[in-house]
Design a protein with these regions (language model features):
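Exported/periplasmic ABC-transporter solute-binding proteins
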Residues: 4-10, 24-260
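C-terminal segment of classical bacterial N-terminal signal peptides
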Residues: 16-24
Length: 260
């Protein structure tokens, strides 16, 4: 990702000046950078993939420009970019809609097919996060997510399934409630999974609460929820607290601009 659009985007996000033609240039020539909030898995994955970070005192530091406008979830990002013809931002590929335009990266369009065959390289995992003490109800819901039934829903919603050979779901005898918390990028597909699952297994209810990846990971760690959602890899210091990540899908990150 060292071609022009990647360079322009990186420069815009860290607040430096780039000479040359911006592929999706705004009428005024200015670029309004729209970023996600600290704690967002999409932001964390994005700055890592584009190298928008520096190492300081042994730790990687996010170098997103202080001039960036911050949005706190996926829907707000889409609405903000759709309403500002000078803007550039980024969003989960599965959440991309026709209110904005996705730009090509290294000549590749942001599509699920291109993510699957590694043509489009701006991609990250969708993880669920669990602790050691998992309820039978939560385990049954996870079994559904990883079954062919769940993986087919993931693919239908525009994401990339992680198990092409998954077997069909077989309901157990668990009962109860499952609370899922975290990433606003994972949230939409998790809600679809929960809806379909509850039609199949009427003995279990699933509540999905959307926030961000870090909140989801922390909530799973502290036992506030049964399952956390994260749209990034977990850090060593997070897994050291006793939680583990399970990849349920793969998702691209689309770089987006205004349709005009």
């Amino acid at each position: 990702m060292k071609k022009r659009i990647a360079g322009i985007l990186t420069a815009a996000l860290i607040g430096t000046t780039v000479m040359g033609t911006v592929v999706m240039a705004a009428p005024s020539g200015a670029i309004d950078v729209i970023s996600r909030e600290d704690g967002s898995g999409t932001r964390g994955a994005f700055v890592e993939l584009f190298g928008i970070e520096e190492e300081k005192d042994g730790e990687k530091v996010d170098m997103t420009t202080q001039e960036a406008s911050i949005t706190n979830n996926t829907d707000v990002m889409l609405t903000t970019v759709a309403g500002d013809e000078n803007s550039i931002g980024y969003v989960s590929l599965g959440s991309l809609n026709d209110t904005v335009k996705a730009v090509k990266i290294d000549g590749a369009e942001a599509t699920a097919e291109n993510v699957a065959d590694d043509t489009y390289k701006v991609a990250r995992p969708f993880n669920i996060v669990t602790g050691d003490k998992l309820s039978d109800a939560a385990q049954d819901f996870i079994n559904y997510i990883m079954s062919s039934d769940g993986q087919d829903i993931i693919e239908k919603e525009g994401y990339i399934k992680v198990d092409e050979k998954a077997e069909a779901y077989k309901a157990g005898d668990a009962k109860g409630k499952v609370v899922v918390m975290g990433s606003s990028s994972v949230g939409p597909v998790m809600e679809k999974l929960a809806e379909a699952y509850q039609k199949t297994n009427k003995n279990i209810t699933v509540e999905v609460q959307v926030s961000d990846s870090t909140t989801g990971i922390n909530s799973a760690t502290e036992g506030v929820c049964d399952i956390g959602m994260a749209s990034r890899e977990l850090k060593d210091e997070e897994t050291e607290k006793g939680v583990k990540a399970t990849e349920i899908a793969k998702d691209g990150i689309a770089v987006i601009v205004n349709n005009d």
